[in-house]
Each structure stands twice: as structure tokens, then as C-alpha cells.
Amino acid sequence: MKRIVYLLLCVMVCGGCAKQKPHQFTNEVLNRMTPIKDQGDSETCWIYAMLATIETEHLRWGDSVNLSPYYIEKMMEQEPDAPESKRGEAATLLRLIEKYGIVGYDAMRSVDTPAPRFVFMLGAEYTPQEFARSLCRPGEYMQLMCDKDKPYYQEMELDMPDNWLHDRYLNIPMDSMIVKTERAVRAHHGVCWEDKEHGMAIVGIAHDENGKKYFIMKNSWGTDRPHGGLDYISFDAFRLHTVAVEMTKEAYGLP
């Protein structure tokens, strides 16, 4: 994504006018997460965001995993319909790990590293596909969107260029999306958030000195930033800019 566009959003969301005093945030919930990574100049935020969501979901159960975004970036080279920019949606990540699997971060710390053929974990050997199935079952996650001009509570394709695999999303009202997202985060589930230009994992909830609520989001631009690489996005901005969120069916409230 274009960082300058997103930075303008952050100014609007978190600071407003530069002369205003910075907000003082109080964290209400801050879920467990793996170390913040840096996507560099790539446009692969969707990979980092959805992998971070899966990691937080497993940390909820005490199962620590740290996954390699570079493995998926390399596997995209085998996809004939993948854009040269390597852009995508979080749902794209779910499709790709189902097909190609996933490996740990320590096994592949660069896109230039050869992709491992096996994953070694707790004395066991897995293929990347077997390892992925142990982390994310097919159909475990669901995609949510909000388009007020289309029927609610029906599945439909998200009409975005980055949805090049033509994944389908459940269309729900924005009020419901905010309620579902807040409830999932407070229950310590991983949730992935996307707007038109960027994607991040939602890892917490906070309020400012005026009681205004924010989602705490784990970014993928490194830690040399305010709040150590976390971003505070107000519920109002979430309402205005959200394109989609992903969470497990359990987090949504389905059996």
C-alpha cells in the first residue's frame, strides 16, 4: 500500500490538527502477539496482517507460533493470476496457505531464502501443508464486509482489485461488524482488518482521555514508530474506512 495515504488516515484518526495535544490512551484489552515485523517497501501488508491474526488466535490457547510472510510472498510467484505488485486480501492469504502451506519465521527470514520443504516443530516433521492445517483448518475463518447498497446477511464477492481470487464475503451492517469485532477482541480472538490501502491485525481496545474508543492494531512497519509499531484507530474511523474483517467462525459466534 501507499504509506503516505495511510499516514494521512492516522493523522485524522489519532491526532487531528498538529497543534492539538496528543491523545493519552488507556488500554482496556491488549491481546498477546508475536514481535512486530517490517514489510519494508513491499505491498504485502495483507500477508503480515492475516498471519498476525492467526498467531494471536493461537496465542489465545497458549500455542506460540511465529510465521514467515516471505514464504507466502515466494509462493505467489507460482500463481499465474497474481499481480506483479503482490497485493492481495487477507482472504487471499487463507487460500494460499491452504494450497502451499506455511513455515515458521525462523525457517525463512527473507524472500531470497529457498523455501523449506519441511517444518520441524516440537520434535515432529511436517510438510508446509500439514503444518498449515494444524494452524488453520479449511473454512475456520470467515470474511465480513459492509456494503449498504447490497443485501445484508448474504455472501458475495468483494468488488476490489486486490481480490484476484474472487473470494466471497458475508455482507453485514457496519453496526454489527463493530459489535462483532469488539466482542471478538475482548474474548482475545485474532481479528484482521482491511481498508482500501492497508491491512493490520486488531490486538486490543483502548480509550482516550475523553472516553472515545479505539481499536489497537498491530502494524507491519517495524517498531521505530509511536507506540512501538501499534496504531490506535478510532471506532469512528473504523466505521468510515473498513473494507473487510476476518475472524474465526467461533469468534463471530457460529458453531
Q: Over which residues does each language-model region extend?
A:
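Sec-dependent signal peptide recognition
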Residues: 2-7
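C-terminal motif of bacterial Sec signal peptides marking the signal peptidase cleavage site
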Residues: 13-16
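Bacterial Sec signal peptide processing site at the extreme N-terminus
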Residues: 18-25
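Active-site signature of cysteine proteases
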Residues: 34, 119-255
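Active-site nucleophilic cysteine motif
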Residues: 39-54, 83-95, 198
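Structural recognition of the beta-strand scaffold that forms the well-ordered cores
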Residues: 44-47, 70-74, 93-96, 104-106, ...
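Structured segments of extracytoplasmic/periplasmic soluble domains
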Residues: 48, 52-61, 96-103, 184
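Papain-like cysteine protease catalytic cores
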Residues: 65-135
